[in-house]
Amino acid sequence: MASLSRALRVAAAHPRQSPTRGMGPCNLSSAAGPTAEKSVPYQRTLKEGQGTSVVAQGPSRPLPSTANVVVIGGGSLGCQTLYHLAKLGMSGAVLLERERLTSGTTWHTAGLLWQLRPSDVEVELLAHTRRVVSRELEEETGLHTGWIQNGGLFIASNRQRLDEYKRLMSLGKAYGVESHVLSPAETKTLYPLMNVDDLYGTLYVPHDGTMDPAGTCTTLARAASARGAQVIENCPVTGIRVWTDDFGVRRVAGVETQHGSIQTPCVVNCAGVWASAVGRMAGVKVPLVAMHHAYVVTERIEGIQNMPNVRDHDASVYLRLQGDALSVGGYEANPIFWEEVSDKFAFGLFDLDWEVFTQHIEGAINRVPVLEKTGIKSTVCGPESFTPDHKPLMGEAPELRGFFLGCGFNSAGMMLGGGCGQELAHWIIHGRPEKDMHGYDIRRFHHSLTDHPRWIRERSHESYAKNYSVVFPHDEPLAGRNMRRDPLHEELLGQGCVFQERHGWERPGWFHPRGPAPVLEYDYYGAYGSRAHEDYAYRRLLADEYTFAFPPHHDTIKKECLACRGAAAVFDMSYFGKFYLVGLDARKAADWLFSADVSRPPGSTVYTCMLNHRGGTESDLTVSRLAPSHQASPLAPAFEGDGYYLAMGGAVAQHNWSHITTVLQDQKSQCQLIDSSEDLGMISIQGPASRAILQEVLDADLSNEAFPFSTHKLLRAAGHLVRAMRLSFVGELGWELHIPKASCVPVYRAVMAAGAKHGLINAGYRAIDSLSIEKGYRHWHADLRPDDSPLEAGLAFTCKLKSPVPFLGREALEQQRAAGLRRRLVCFTMEDKVPMFGLEAIWRNGQVVGHVRRADFGFAIDKTIAYGYIHDPSGGPVSLDFVKSGDYALERMGVTYGAQAHLKSPFDPNNKRVKGIY
């Protein structure tokens, strides 16, 4: 028997080889040293699995010839998806597992469930998983899933970590999740074996717990089978059949296996680390990597029984209660990649690399000192799949209709499985999930990145290594940068631009007055023999963001904002998505796609939403009507019929493209969608002086009469043809210039030269965030999401409900309007100058009625501004009188601050400034 202290000595005496080198699977009898004994809960299954593969014995039951949906993979996600499909009434659902249920990754997972995460959607998903495993499955089947409610304890060794936990506690109040911030002394009383000398405090969540993966998956399979679903084990999938319809759309046709084929229109890829291989069978890109992920199980520890599970984030270690012992694991900076994923791997394990694992042992011994003299009963090192942003991959693949993803769960497949299985089932049956799943949707990644090996590897490494880091609101990745750069990148970098990354693009964040801060090649934080960058200016500036207070450059952002309000600012918005929708059916398609009336004369520009069939908002964007053109140019493609120019936030361009494409396919529209995002740049000149500046650059009259708001024209700027639009995302007089790529730099320089005497300065997206919330403009996927309707969000003016023209989502909006709104988006301001970022609880008359979706500081009104949806605790409609009559407060990190509710933006509520009235 090895002890944890001996393991530390072994690791020190035997340095390991390159961390990137893949290691082959081992069976129970082949391990040496501390890994000789692996008495994990599935030892019998493992030993049985070392003989002849069960696959050779044939499938566990005959294959049906047809199915309505085939789920590939019998792990947590596969079983949860099958169960929820059956529960929602889907007939003909089949699950294919190449070995036995839980093989591959699920069988060796720790099975932890924490109820609080820094995401409102994830809190909801976790709550559903907990309901399923702790109550619903047992009620349905009479079987125990192995759920144990022993509570969870998050450890804070510094002030910022404790602040993060207080944020989680405030969010939990909006969802009824009980949690308590404990002092070190209170923590010691709860967990007597814990060292609390270095603690600032802890967050205790009494209803957290653990799940048994084998028990849960077996029970899910039985419950699904009772509802008519089929589970077929020992049946590897060897291919995906695809057909192309009359409109050139690729669709799923069937599944091939070693034992026959199944005709089906729908496949769900829940294959874990093998998901990329399954994707390749269908020509679908699945951006994930496989890594070794490990934990050790200790011998018996006196006094550990009934203790809560522990996450010591600052030590990057977790301690899971396992009877009268502990499982110890975590996330390291130098994880081992599994370079060549074997399709023979089922219930095997890797040898544990003690040098890699040492840091977790050190952290565990520091937190629970008795572990230093405690023996190691077993080690478990198996494969897990990880993704570029540490979020799962879900939804319909943009390359293939009927091919859904449910993979890449970053070692959280058990805890997220119930919620995600339910949402995936809705996605398959109804075309969309019920919740806002954009953060998990495969369409959140641009298609140019999802098969880019360096980007996938770098980002997956960084997200793994930072998994236990504090989640700060304005953090940025260092990995996978400079993938997409617009024509102004070098120009702005030289002027001190500090860039953010969105959708692969480098976009301006803010401008540092002390010179360039370029993003350098990823250094893996010094792991794998890489040399960490020294004197890295960008990393230093990013470190200033690691706070829940105002950052040091708060005043720099203030300067950018007030320059825009008082004179003028230029924003490089080239990362925007820019599409053309043209063709004979383009007007019919536009009427159906867009909630607003966009059938205005050429030269008009309309702000609109795109909705789903439930009336939820899939996008907000501008749509500009084009005049027919017989000669193509970057600013106007040649087309017959009708044409529209679409511009939307670049971070969601792929989502928009996929949504529009799917709707056009479903409607069988005869029109063309053209992506010109890479061909055009875009700068926005905003502020009271913008007209005077641009009048020197553009060859046209810019008066209100000659160039009204919400119109566009093809003009020349410093001799270059551009599309000028009179629009504003910040609530000021201003114009956007959409510019062919080759003309961006000369046009930008001409604007800056003309603006020098007017006080024109560069500004970035941190300023846009502040200016736009101050004006009351919405940001998609912040205060406007696929589960929010325009009526709830105060955007009824974007919906052509007074016209007879049908549009996608109209029926749902009409039903919602007739029934009364059950929640509304409300603007709040506070006199206390404290930063808020979202997730803060909203109190009304002493009751929690929601949480903040988005918040920032408004420099013109000199107040913190927050937006959040509120509901009536009694369950009734939320009227305007309900909003106005309440006494409000916002809870930030456990402290409440009085707040004033507004029905309109407190800044320029009559919209005079965008009209040029100052």
Curated annotation (Swiss-Prot):
Signal peptide: none annotated. Pathway: Amine and polyamine degradation; sarcosine degradation; formaldehyde and glycine from sarcosine: step 1/1. Keywords: Acetylation, Disease variant, FAD, Flavoprotein, Mitochondrion, Oxidoreductase, Phosphoprotein, Transit peptide. Its cofactor is FAD. InterPro entries: FAD-dep_OxRdtase, FAD/NAD-bd_sf, FAO_M, GCST_C, GCV_T_N, GcvT/YgfZ/DmdA, GcvT/YgfZ_C, TrmE/GcvT_dom1. Its EC number is 1.5.8.3. Binds 1 FAD covalently per monomer. The modification Phosphotyrosine is found at residue 777. Disulfide bonds: none annotated. The modification Tele-8alpha-FAD histidine is found at residue 108. One of its GO terms (biological process) is sarcosine catabolic process. Residues 1-22 form a transit peptide. It catalyses: (6S)-5,6,7,8-tetrahydrofolyl-(gamma-L-Glu)(n) + sarcosine + oxidized [electron-transfer flavoprotein] + H(+) = (6R)-5,10-methylenetetrahydrofolyl-(gamma-L-Glu)(n) + reduced [electron-transfer flavoprotein] + glycine. Residues 1-13 have a biased composition (Low complexity). Residues 1-40 are annotated as: Disordered. It comes from the Eukaryota. Expressed in pancreas, liver and kidney. It is linked to Sarcosinemia: A metabolic disorder characterized by an increased concentration of sarcosine in plasma and an increased excretion of sarcosine in urine. Sarcosinemia is most probably a benign condition without significant clinical problems. Some reports have associated sarcosinemia with intellectual disability and neurologic problems. Catalyzes the last step of the oxidative degradation of choline to glycine. Converts sarcosine into glycine. This is Sarcosine dehydrogenase, mitochondrial. It comes from Homo sapiens.
